[in-house]
């Protein structure tokens, strides 16, 4: 299905507590320098813009491959560059495999780290050490985002695109941040998205939209795609930076 992802940078205000534009720019430069090759591959295989993958890495971990919800280096279920939870990642990969959505390159990279599938489409459990591997963490994080986008663009799920085939990035960010999607492969209910229903037929003003989310989700969205946020920087100041 063809769709466009809107990346608005106007109408949102930066949270007072977040770093300066200069500091965030340096973080993005470091992420692209250190992991640009992996981001480029993940982008090509998942069809998710490299800028979006990079921004997720920035928001989730600041580019620290050992970042953990319980402290750097600890073996928390949520760990690594894109902070996905290994407790549900096995089922995520098995769904992709059974649906024949894993590309040859994705399978090769997974196999490189010992993640293969048996005749029934089953694979091994994902470990803490797997999450610390930058290439693998970025690839799997992008696969999770790809599944989420597929769900959000399915007209049979009640999350259909609007008439302009516009995929709202706020939805992707909110569901990924909440960790609701990966557990089941299904988006639960709109009422659970930031605590309020989200209008799927009208693209609201983003200030009004983000104002309806809880503070954690609001700050996450602001940092990702607000004024002076990661996507603002990546699509302007760093738009010519080369990945890989």
Model-derived features: where do they sit?
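Short, functionally critical alpha-helical segments immediately adjacent to catalytic or ligand/cofactor-binding
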Residues: 47-67, 79-85, 89, 141, ...
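Non-catalytic cell-wall polysaccharide-engagement segments
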Residues: 2-14, 26-31, 37-38, 44, ...
């Amino acid at each position: 299905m063809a769709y466009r992802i809107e990346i608005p940078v106007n109408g949102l205000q930066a949270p007072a507590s977040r770093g300066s534009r200069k500091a965030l720019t340096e973080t993005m430069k470091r992420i692209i320098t250190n992991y640009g090759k992996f981001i480029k591959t993940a982008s090509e295989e998942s069809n998710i813009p490299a800028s979006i993958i990079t921004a997720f890495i920035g928001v989730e971990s600041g580019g620290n491959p050992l970042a953990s919800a319980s402290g750097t280096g600890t073996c928390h279920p949520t760990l690594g560059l894109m902070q996905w939870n290994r407790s549900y990642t096995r089922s995520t990969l098995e769904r992709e495999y059974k649906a024949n959505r894993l590309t040859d390159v994705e399978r090769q990279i997974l196999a490189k780290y010992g993640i293969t599938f048996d005749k029934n489409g089953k694979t091994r459990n994902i470990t803490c050490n797997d999450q610390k591997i930058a290439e693998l963490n970025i690839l799997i994080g992008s696969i999770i985002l790809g599944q989420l986008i597929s769900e959000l663009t399915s007209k049979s799920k009640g999350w259909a695109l609007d008439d302009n085939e516009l995929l709202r990035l706020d939805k992707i960010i909110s569901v990924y941040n909440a960790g609701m999607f990966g557990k089941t492969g299904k988006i639960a209910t709109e009422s659970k998205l930031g605590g309020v229903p989200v209008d799927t037929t009208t693209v609201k003003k983003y200030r009004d939209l983000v104002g309806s989310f809880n503070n954690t989700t609001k700050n996450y969205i602001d940092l990702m795609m607000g004024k002076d946020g990661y996507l603002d920087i990546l699509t302007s100041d760093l738009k010519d930076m080369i990945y890989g």
